[in-house]
A protein has these predicted regions:
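Alpha-helical recognition segments enriched in aromatics with Gly/Pro capping
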Residues: 1-32, 47, 97, 118-325
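N-terminal, positively charged nucleic-acid-binding surface of large information/translation enzymes
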Residues: 8-13, 17-105, 458-462
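Short phosphate-binding/catalytic loops that engage adenosine nucleotides
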Residues: 58, 132, 451
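Short, glycine/charge-rich beta-strand/loop segments that flank catalytic centers
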Residues: 66-70, 92-95, 105-120, 138-147
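The substrate-binding groove and active-site-proximal loops of carbohydrate-active enzymes
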Residues: 78-84, 108-114, 225
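Structural preference for alpha-helix termini/caps and helix-kink/transition segments
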Residues: 264, 271-465
Protein backbone atom coordinates (compact mmCIF):
# COMPACT_ATOMS: atom_id res chain seq x y z
CA UNK A 1 0.00 0.00 0.00
CA UNK A 2 1.18 3.51 -0.83
CA UNK A 3 0.06 6.59 1.08
CA UNK A 4 0.69 10.27 0.45
CA UNK A 5 3.00 11.51 3.20
CA UNK A 6 2.55 15.22 3.94
CA UNK A 7 6.02 15.20 5.51
CA UNK A 8 7.75 14.27 2.23
CA UNK A 9 5.04 15.46 -0.16
CA UNK A 10 5.02 12.20 -2.09
CA UNK A 11 3.39 8.78 -2.12
CA UNK A 12 5.40 6.25 -0.18
CA UNK A 13 5.19 2.53 0.45
CA UNK A 14 3.64 1.94 3.86
CA UNK A 15 6.26 0.04 5.85
CA UNK A 16 5.29 -0.44 9.51
CA UNK A 17 7.78 -0.10 12.34
CA UNK A 18 6.87 -3.59 13.54
CA UNK A 19 5.90 -6.06 10.79
CA UNK A 20 2.19 -6.82 10.87
CA UNK A 21 1.37 -4.00 13.29
CA UNK A 22 0.27 -0.39 12.80
CA UNK A 23 0.19 2.31 15.46
CA UNK A 24 -1.92 5.27 14.38
CA UNK A 25 -3.26 8.42 16.00
CA UNK A 26 -5.96 10.82 14.88
CA UNK A 27 -6.74 14.15 16.49
CA UNK A 28 -10.25 13.99 17.89
CA UNK A 29 -12.80 16.74 18.55
CA UNK A 30 -12.75 19.63 20.97
CA UNK A 31 -16.00 18.82 22.74
CA UNK A 32 -17.94 22.04 23.16
CA UNK A 33 -20.61 21.63 20.46
CA UNK A 34 -22.08 19.16 17.97
CA UNK A 35 -19.70 18.06 15.23
CA UNK A 36 -20.28 19.47 11.74
CA UNK A 37 -19.87 17.77 8.38
CA UNK A 38 -16.28 18.98 8.06
CA UNK A 39 -15.40 17.43 11.44
CA UNK A 40 -16.98 14.16 10.32
CA UNK A 41 -14.79 13.69 7.26
CA UNK A 42 -11.61 12.65 9.11
CA UNK A 43 -13.74 10.45 11.37
CA UNK A 44 -15.03 8.47 8.38
CA UNK A 45 -11.84 8.54 6.30
CA UNK A 46 -9.52 7.31 9.03
CA UNK A 47 -12.11 4.81 10.22
CA UNK A 48 -11.85 3.35 6.72
CA UNK A 49 -8.04 3.46 6.83
CA UNK A 50 -8.15 1.45 10.05
CA UNK A 51 -10.75 -0.98 8.62
CA UNK A 52 -8.72 -1.48 5.45
CA UNK A 53 -5.45 -2.07 7.29
CA UNK A 54 -7.20 -4.70 9.42
CA UNK A 55 -8.76 -6.19 6.28
CA UNK A 56 -5.23 -6.59 4.88
CA UNK A 57 -4.17 -8.42 8.01
CA UNK A 58 -2.56 -5.73 10.16
CA UNK A 59 -3.06 -5.54 13.91
CA UNK A 60 -3.99 -1.86 14.32
CA UNK A 61 -3.73 0.06 17.57
CA UNK A 62 -5.68 3.25 16.97
CA UNK A 63 -5.83 6.16 19.40
CA UNK A 64 -8.20 9.09 18.92
CA UNK A 65 -8.43 11.67 21.69
CA UNK A 66 -10.96 14.05 23.12
CA UNK A 67 -9.80 17.61 23.83
CA UNK A 68 -11.92 18.10 26.94
CA UNK A 69 -10.26 21.27 28.27
CA UNK A 70 -9.95 24.29 25.99
CA UNK A 71 -10.79 28.00 25.77
CA UNK A 72 -13.97 27.21 23.81
CA UNK A 73 -15.15 24.70 26.40
CA UNK A 74 -14.46 27.14 29.23
CA UNK A 75 -16.29 29.92 27.38
CA UNK A 76 -19.32 27.68 26.83
CA UNK A 77 -19.31 26.62 30.48
CA UNK A 78 -19.20 30.23 31.63
CA UNK A 79 -22.09 31.13 29.33
CA UNK A 80 -24.18 28.31 30.80
CA UNK A 81 -22.89 28.80 34.38
CA UNK A 82 -21.83 25.16 34.70
CA UNK A 83 -18.56 23.32 35.31
CA UNK A 84 -16.39 22.79 32.22
CA UNK A 85 -16.64 19.01 32.66
CA UNK A 86 -20.42 19.17 32.27
CA UNK A 87 -19.94 20.70 28.81
CA UNK A 88 -17.25 18.24 27.73
CA UNK A 89 -19.11 15.16 28.99
CA UNK A 90 -22.34 16.32 27.33
CA UNK A 91 -20.69 16.72 23.94
CA UNK A 92 -18.65 13.55 24.22
CA UNK A 93 -21.98 11.76 24.56
CA UNK A 94 -23.38 13.66 21.57
CA UNK A 95 -20.22 12.86 19.62
CA UNK A 96 -20.74 9.14 20.13
CA UNK A 97 -24.35 9.42 18.99
CA UNK A 98 -23.16 10.91 15.70
CA UNK A 99 -20.09 8.66 15.35
CA UNK A 100 -22.18 5.54 15.91
CA UNK A 101 -24.76 6.83 13.44
CA UNK A 102 -21.98 7.27 10.87
CA UNK A 103 -20.84 3.68 11.56
CA UNK A 104 -17.47 4.90 12.83
CA UNK A 105 -15.89 2.22 14.98
CA UNK A 106 -14.58 3.26 18.37
CA UNK A 107 -10.81 3.62 18.47
CA UNK A 108 -8.75 1.15 20.45
CA UNK A 109 -8.38 3.93 23.02
CA UNK A 110 -10.26 7.25 23.21
CA UNK A 111 -8.36 9.15 25.91
CA UNK A 112 -9.25 12.54 27.36
CA UNK A 113 -6.69 15.29 27.83
CA UNK A 114 -7.70 15.80 31.47
CA UNK A 115 -6.92 12.14 32.22
CA UNK A 116 -3.31 12.68 31.15
CA UNK A 117 -2.16 15.76 33.07
CA UNK A 118 0.63 13.74 34.72
CA UNK A 119 2.08 12.72 31.34
CA UNK A 120 1.79 16.30 30.10
CA UNK A 121 3.69 17.62 33.13
CA UNK A 122 6.37 14.94 32.67
CA UNK A 123 6.95 15.96 29.04
CA UNK A 124 7.04 19.68 29.84
CA UNK A 125 9.50 19.11 32.70
CA UNK A 126 11.80 17.18 30.37
CA UNK A 127 11.57 19.88 27.68
CA UNK A 128 12.59 22.51 30.24
CA UNK A 129 15.48 20.34 31.46
CA UNK A 130 16.71 19.91 27.89
CA UNK A 131 16.45 23.64 27.18
CA UNK A 132 13.60 23.38 24.67
CA UNK A 133 11.03 25.13 26.87
CA UNK A 134 11.06 27.95 29.40
CA UNK A 135 8.87 29.20 32.21
CA UNK A 136 7.62 32.80 32.26
CA UNK A 137 5.29 34.08 34.98
CA UNK A 138 3.58 30.72 35.42
CA UNK A 139 3.27 30.04 31.69
CA UNK A 140 5.60 27.60 29.93
CA UNK A 141 6.53 28.13 26.28
CA UNK A 142 8.23 25.91 23.73
CA UNK A 143 11.21 27.65 22.12
CA UNK A 144 10.80 27.02 18.41
CA UNK A 145 14.25 28.34 17.49
CA UNK A 146 15.80 25.49 19.51
CA UNK A 147 14.25 22.89 17.17
CA UNK A 148 16.16 23.08 13.89
CA UNK A 149 13.51 21.14 11.96
CA UNK A 150 10.62 23.42 12.90
CA UNK A 151 8.44 23.92 9.83
CA UNK A 152 9.33 20.60 8.17
CA UNK A 153 5.74 19.33 8.04
CA UNK A 154 4.19 22.52 6.65
CA UNK A 155 7.32 23.10 4.53
CA UNK A 156 7.73 26.62 5.87
CA UNK A 157 11.12 27.76 7.22
CA UNK A 158 10.99 29.25 10.72
CA UNK A 159 12.23 32.63 9.48
CA UNK A 160 9.30 32.84 7.03
CA UNK A 161 6.84 31.97 9.78
CA UNK A 162 8.37 34.53 12.13
CA UNK A 163 8.08 37.26 9.50
CA UNK A 164 4.29 37.11 9.70
CA UNK A 165 3.99 36.53 13.44
CA UNK A 166 3.85 38.90 16.39
CA UNK A 167 3.69 38.74 20.16
CA UNK A 168 0.22 39.60 21.47
CA UNK A 169 -0.34 42.07 24.29
CA UNK A 170 0.00 40.29 27.62
CA UNK A 171 2.18 37.45 26.30
CA UNK A 172 5.59 36.95 27.87
CA UNK A 173 7.15 34.61 25.33
CA UNK A 174 10.59 35.33 23.89
CA UNK A 175 9.90 34.87 20.18
CA UNK A 176 6.72 35.31 18.09
CA UNK A 177 6.53 31.62 17.07
CA UNK A 178 7.00 30.23 20.57
CA UNK A 179 3.82 28.55 21.79
CA UNK A 180 2.35 27.72 25.18
CA UNK A 181 2.62 24.20 26.53
CA UNK A 182 1.31 25.26 29.96
CA UNK A 183 -0.96 28.20 30.74
CA UNK A 184 -0.99 29.84 34.17
CA UNK A 185 -4.31 29.70 35.98
CA UNK A 186 -6.79 32.52 35.49
CA UNK A 187 -9.52 33.41 37.99
CA UNK A 188 -12.56 31.17 37.60
CA UNK A 189 -10.86 28.72 35.20
CA UNK A 190 -10.11 25.05 35.88
CA UNK A 191 -6.51 24.42 36.91
CA UNK A 192 -4.15 21.65 37.97
CA UNK A 193 -1.09 21.73 40.21
CA UNK A 194 2.29 21.77 38.46
CA UNK A 195 5.93 22.66 39.21
CA UNK A 196 5.19 26.09 37.66
CA UNK A 197 2.08 26.77 39.70
CA UNK A 198 -1.57 26.06 39.02
CA UNK A 199 -2.58 26.05 35.37
CA UNK A 200 -3.74 23.94 32.46
CA UNK A 201 -2.09 22.43 29.39
CA UNK A 202 -1.86 23.97 25.94
CA UNK A 203 -3.69 22.21 23.13
CA UNK A 204 -0.63 20.95 21.25
CA UNK A 205 1.04 19.28 24.23
CA UNK A 206 -2.10 17.28 24.98
CA UNK A 207 -1.85 15.27 21.76
CA UNK A 208 1.89 14.73 22.17
CA UNK A 209 1.29 13.34 25.65
CA UNK A 210 -1.50 10.98 24.61
CA UNK A 211 0.50 9.77 21.60
CA UNK A 212 3.46 9.00 23.84
CA UNK A 213 1.51 7.41 26.70
CA UNK A 214 -0.59 5.06 24.59
CA UNK A 215 1.54 4.44 21.49
CA UNK A 216 5.16 5.06 22.51
CA UNK A 217 7.99 7.24 21.20
CA UNK A 218 7.38 6.72 17.47
CA UNK A 219 4.15 5.87 15.66
CA UNK A 220 3.45 4.69 12.14
CA UNK A 221 0.67 7.06 11.05
CA UNK A 222 -0.57 10.38 12.37
CA UNK A 223 -3.68 11.70 10.66
CA UNK A 224 -6.14 14.57 10.69
CA UNK A 225 -7.58 17.40 8.62
CA UNK A 226 -5.42 19.65 6.46
CA UNK A 227 -6.27 22.56 8.75
CA UNK A 228 -4.24 20.87 11.51
CA UNK A 229 -0.96 20.73 9.58
CA UNK A 230 0.04 24.12 10.96
CA UNK A 231 0.35 24.93 13.74
CA UNK A 232 -1.04 21.90 15.59
CA UNK A 233 0.80 19.03 13.95
CA UNK A 234 3.93 21.10 13.39
CA UNK A 235 4.02 21.83 17.11
CA UNK A 236 3.33 18.21 18.02
CA UNK A 237 6.40 17.17 16.04
CA UNK A 238 8.58 19.81 17.73
CA UNK A 239 7.51 18.87 21.26
CA UNK A 240 7.58 15.11 20.77
CA UNK A 241 10.89 14.86 18.94
CA UNK A 242 12.62 17.16 21.41
CA UNK A 243 11.20 15.12 24.29
CA UNK A 244 12.11 11.65 22.97
CA UNK A 245 15.00 12.43 20.64
CA UNK A 246 13.32 10.15 18.08
CA UNK A 247 11.12 10.62 14.99
CA UNK A 248 7.52 11.25 16.05
CA UNK A 249 5.55 9.73 13.15
CA UNK A 250 6.70 8.09 9.92
CA UNK A 251 3.62 8.98 7.85
CA UNK A 252 1.38 12.03 8.03
CA UNK A 253 -2.00 11.75 6.29
CA UNK A 254 -4.35 14.72 5.95
CA UNK A 255 -7.85 14.87 4.50
CA UNK A 256 -9.18 17.75 2.39
CA UNK A 257 -11.78 20.31 3.32
CA UNK A 258 -15.55 20.26 2.96
CA UNK A 259 -16.63 23.34 1.03
CA UNK A 260 -19.96 25.12 0.83
CA UNK A 261 -20.20 27.08 -2.41
CA UNK A 262 -16.46 26.46 -2.80
CA UNK A 263 -15.64 28.08 0.57
CA UNK A 264 -14.24 25.94 3.42
CA UNK A 265 -16.92 24.91 5.91
CA UNK A 266 -16.12 26.22 9.39
CA UNK A 267 -17.83 27.35 12.57
CA UNK A 268 -15.99 30.68 12.43
CA UNK A 269 -17.50 31.49 9.02
CA UNK A 270 -20.94 30.30 10.07
CA UNK A 271 -21.33 28.25 6.87
CA UNK A 272 -21.45 24.87 8.59
CA UNK A 273 -24.06 22.12 8.87
CA UNK A 274 -24.02 19.85 11.90
CA UNK A 275 -24.04 16.12 11.33
CA UNK A 276 -27.07 15.90 13.60
CA UNK A 277 -29.15 18.37 11.58
CA UNK A 278 -28.33 16.70 8.26
CA UNK A 279 -28.91 13.22 9.69
CA UNK A 280 -32.32 14.16 11.05
CA UNK A 281 -33.38 15.05 7.52
CA UNK A 282 -31.52 12.47 5.41
CA UNK A 283 -30.14 9.83 7.77
CA UNK A 284 -26.50 9.19 8.67
CA UNK A 285 -25.45 6.84 5.89
CA UNK A 286 -25.76 9.39 3.04
CA UNK A 287 -23.37 11.61 5.02
CA UNK A 288 -20.83 8.80 5.31
CA UNK A 289 -21.21 8.03 1.62
CA UNK A 290 -20.65 11.69 0.71
CA UNK A 291 -17.53 11.94 2.87
CA UNK A 292 -15.85 8.92 1.27
CA UNK A 293 -17.10 9.43 -2.29
CA UNK A 294 -14.02 11.43 -3.33
CA UNK A 295 -10.33 10.67 -2.81
CA UNK A 296 -9.66 11.78 0.76
CA UNK A 297 -7.15 14.54 -0.05
CA UNK A 298 -9.53 16.21 -2.51
CA UNK A 299 -12.03 18.84 -1.39
CA UNK A 300 -15.73 17.96 -1.37
CA UNK A 301 -18.48 20.45 -2.07
CA UNK A 302 -21.53 20.04 0.15
CA UNK A 303 -25.04 20.70 -1.14
CA UNK A 304 -28.53 19.27 -0.86
CA UNK A 305 -28.32 18.05 -4.47
CA UNK A 306 -25.14 16.10 -3.72
CA UNK A 307 -26.67 14.49 -0.61
CA UNK A 308 -29.65 13.39 -2.72
CA UNK A 309 -27.27 11.88 -5.28
CA UNK A 310 -25.65 9.94 -2.44
CA UNK A 311 -29.07 8.66 -1.34
CA UNK A 312 -29.77 7.47 -4.90
CA UNK A 313 -26.41 5.68 -5.03
CA UNK A 314 -27.04 3.99 -1.69
CA UNK A 315 -30.49 2.90 -2.85
CA UNK A 316 -28.85 1.06 -5.76
CA UNK A 317 -26.66 -0.79 -3.27
CA UNK A 318 -29.55 -1.59 -0.93
CA UNK A 319 -31.74 -2.75 -3.81
CA UNK A 320 -29.03 -5.11 -4.99
CA UNK A 321 -28.46 -6.53 -1.51
CA UNK A 322 -32.19 -6.91 -0.83
CA UNK A 323 -32.63 -8.62 -4.20
CA UNK A 324 -29.94 -11.13 -3.25
CA UNK A 325 -31.81 -11.91 -0.03
CA UNK A 326 -34.96 -12.49 -2.08
CA UNK A 327 -33.12 -14.76 -4.52
CA UNK A 328 -31.57 -16.73 -1.65
CA UNK A 329 -35.01 -17.62 -0.27
CA UNK A 330 -36.02 -19.09 -3.63
CA UNK A 331 -32.66 -20.47 -4.80
CA UNK A 332 -32.27 -24.12 -5.76
CA UNK A 333 -29.56 -26.25 -4.14
CA UNK A 334 -28.43 -27.68 -7.48
CA UNK A 335 -25.70 -25.62 -9.13
CA UNK A 336 -25.91 -24.55 -12.75
CA UNK A 337 -23.18 -25.19 -15.27
CA UNK A 338 -21.87 -21.63 -15.47
CA UNK A 339 -22.09 -20.79 -11.77
CA UNK A 340 -18.43 -21.39 -10.95
CA UNK A 341 -17.32 -19.11 -13.79
CA UNK A 342 -19.56 -16.30 -12.54
CA UNK A 343 -18.47 -16.76 -8.91
CA UNK A 344 -14.80 -16.84 -9.87
CA UNK A 345 -15.42 -13.71 -11.94
CA UNK A 346 -16.38 -11.83 -8.77
CA UNK A 347 -12.73 -12.02 -7.69
CA UNK A 348 -11.76 -9.33 -10.19
CA UNK A 349 -13.84 -6.79 -8.27
CA UNK A 350 -11.91 -7.57 -5.11
CA UNK A 351 -8.67 -7.10 -7.04
CA UNK A 352 -9.89 -3.75 -8.41
CA UNK A 353 -11.00 -2.71 -4.93
CA UNK A 354 -7.65 -3.57 -3.34
CA UNK A 355 -5.76 -1.87 -6.16
CA UNK A 356 -7.73 1.32 -5.55
CA UNK A 357 -7.34 1.24 -1.78
CA UNK A 358 -3.63 0.44 -2.04
CA UNK A 359 -3.26 3.63 -4.08
CA UNK A 360 -3.42 6.12 -1.21
CA UNK A 361 -6.82 4.98 0.02
CA UNK A 362 -8.66 5.83 -3.20
CA UNK A 363 -12.20 5.28 -1.95
CA UNK A 364 -13.71 6.82 -5.08
CA UNK A 365 -12.29 4.08 -7.31
CA UNK A 366 -13.04 1.46 -4.65
CA UNK A 367 -16.71 2.48 -4.72
CA UNK A 368 -16.64 2.28 -8.52
CA UNK A 369 -15.48 -1.34 -8.29
CA UNK A 370 -18.44 -2.11 -5.99
CA UNK A 371 -20.88 -0.69 -8.53
CA UNK A 372 -19.27 -2.84 -11.24
CA UNK A 373 -19.93 -5.82 -8.98
CA UNK A 374 -23.55 -4.66 -8.61
CA UNK A 375 -23.94 -4.50 -12.40
CA UNK A 376 -22.57 -8.03 -12.70
CA UNK A 377 -24.95 -9.29 -9.99
CA UNK A 378 -27.95 -7.59 -11.60
CA UNK A 379 -27.02 -9.09 -14.98
CA UNK A 380 -26.08 -12.63 -13.98
CA UNK A 381 -27.78 -13.37 -10.66
CA UNK A 382 -30.91 -11.35 -9.93
CA UNK A 383 -33.97 -12.71 -11.73
CA UNK A 384 -32.02 -15.60 -13.30
CA UNK A 385 -33.34 -18.38 -11.01
CA UNK A 386 -29.82 -18.70 -9.58
CA UNK A 387 -28.47 -21.54 -7.47
CA UNK A 388 -27.91 -21.12 -3.75
CA UNK A 389 -24.12 -21.28 -4.25
CA UNK A 390 -24.20 -18.45 -6.80
CA UNK A 391 -26.32 -16.18 -4.60
CA UNK A 392 -24.16 -16.90 -1.55
CA UNK A 393 -21.04 -16.12 -3.60
CA UNK A 394 -22.52 -12.79 -4.69
CA UNK A 395 -23.57 -11.92 -1.13
CA UNK A 396 -20.14 -12.79 0.26
CA UNK A 397 -18.32 -10.51 -2.18
CA UNK A 398 -20.84 -7.68 -1.80
CA UNK A 399 -20.69 -7.77 2.01
CA UNK A 400 -16.90 -8.07 2.03
CA UNK A 401 -16.28 -4.94 -0.05
CA UNK A 402 -19.04 -2.75 1.37
CA UNK A 403 -17.97 -3.81 4.87
CA UNK A 404 -14.46 -2.44 4.41
CA UNK A 405 -15.98 0.94 3.55
CA UNK A 406 -18.55 0.65 6.33
CA UNK A 407 -21.46 0.97 3.89
CA UNK A 408 -24.89 -0.70 3.67
CA UNK A 409 -25.10 -0.92 7.45
CA UNK A 410 -28.70 0.18 7.99
CA UNK A 411 -30.39 -2.96 6.70
CA UNK A 412 -33.25 -3.38 9.17
CA UNK A 413 -34.19 -6.70 7.68
CA UNK A 414 -35.98 -8.46 10.55
CA UNK A 415 -38.64 -5.92 11.54
CA UNK A 416 -38.95 -4.32 8.13
CA UNK A 417 -39.13 -7.60 6.24
CA UNK A 418 -41.85 -9.04 8.46
CA UNK A 419 -43.97 -5.90 8.12
CA UNK A 420 -43.45 -5.73 4.39
CA UNK A 421 -44.02 -9.42 3.80
CA UNK A 422 -47.28 -9.35 5.77
CA UNK A 423 -48.56 -6.59 3.51
CA UNK A 424 -47.25 -8.35 0.41
CA UNK A 425 -49.04 -11.55 1.44
CA UNK A 426 -52.26 -9.60 1.96
CA UNK A 427 -51.86 -8.05 -1.48
CA UNK A 428 -51.17 -11.45 -3.05
CA UNK A 429 -54.36 -12.83 -1.49
CA UNK A 430 -56.30 -9.81 -2.73
CA UNK A 431 -55.01 -10.42 -6.26
CA UNK A 432 -55.98 -14.10 -6.07
CA UNK A 433 -59.48 -13.01 -5.08
CA UNK A 434 -59.41 -10.45 -7.92
CA UNK A 435 -59.88 -7.68 -5.37
CA UNK A 436 -57.88 -5.24 -7.46
CA UNK A 437 -58.89 -2.18 -5.45
CA UNK A 438 -57.50 -3.70 -2.24
CA UNK A 439 -54.35 -4.86 -4.04
CA UNK A 440 -53.79 -1.35 -5.37
CA UNK A 441 -54.46 0.15 -1.94
CA UNK A 442 -51.79 -2.06 -0.35
CA UNK A 443 -49.34 -1.25 -3.14
CA UNK A 444 -49.92 2.46 -2.50
CA UNK A 445 -49.50 1.93 1.24
CA UNK A 446 -46.18 0.22 0.67
CA UNK A 447 -45.08 3.01 -1.66
CA UNK A 448 -45.76 5.53 1.11
CA UNK A 449 -43.46 3.42 3.30
CA UNK A 450 -40.77 3.77 0.63
CA UNK A 451 -41.24 0.21 -0.68
CA UNK A 452 -41.64 -0.48 -4.39
CA UNK A 453 -43.09 -3.83 -5.52
CA UNK A 454 -42.08 -5.83 -8.56
CA UNK A 455 -44.09 -8.86 -9.69
CA UNK A 456 -41.82 -11.65 -11.02
CA UNK A 457 -42.22 -15.28 -12.04
CA UNK A 458 -40.66 -16.28 -8.71
CA UNK A 459 -42.99 -14.07 -6.70
CA UNK A 460 -43.19 -10.48 -5.55
CA UNK A 461 -39.92 -8.63 -4.96
CA UNK A 462 -39.61 -5.34 -3.14
CA UNK A 463 -36.95 -2.71 -2.79
CA UNK A 464 -36.57 0.65 -1.12
CA UNK A 465 -37.52 3.63 -3.24
Amino acid sequence: MKVYNTLTRKKEELVPITPGEIKMYACGPTVYNYIHIGNARPLCIFDILRRYLEYRGYNVKFVQNFTDIDDKIIRRANEEHVDFSEISERYIKEFWTDADGLNVRHATINPKATENIDAIIQIISTLIEKGYAYEAQGDVYFSTEKFKDYGKLSHQPLEDLEAGARIMVGEVKREPMDFAVWKAAKPGEPAWDSPWGKGRPGWHIECSAMNWRYLGDTIDIHCGGQDLIFPHHENEIAQSECFTGKPFAHYWMHNGYINVDNVKMSKSLGNFFTVRDVAEKYGYEPIRYLLISAQYRSPINYSTDIIEQCIAALNRLYTCRDSLDFELKNAADAEHGGDKTIIDGFDKYREQFISAMDDDLNTADAIASIFELVRDINTNVVGKTPSKALVEGAIAMFDELTGVLGLVYNRKTETLDSDVEALIEARTNARKEKNWAEADRIRDQLKEMGIVLEDTAQGVKWHRE
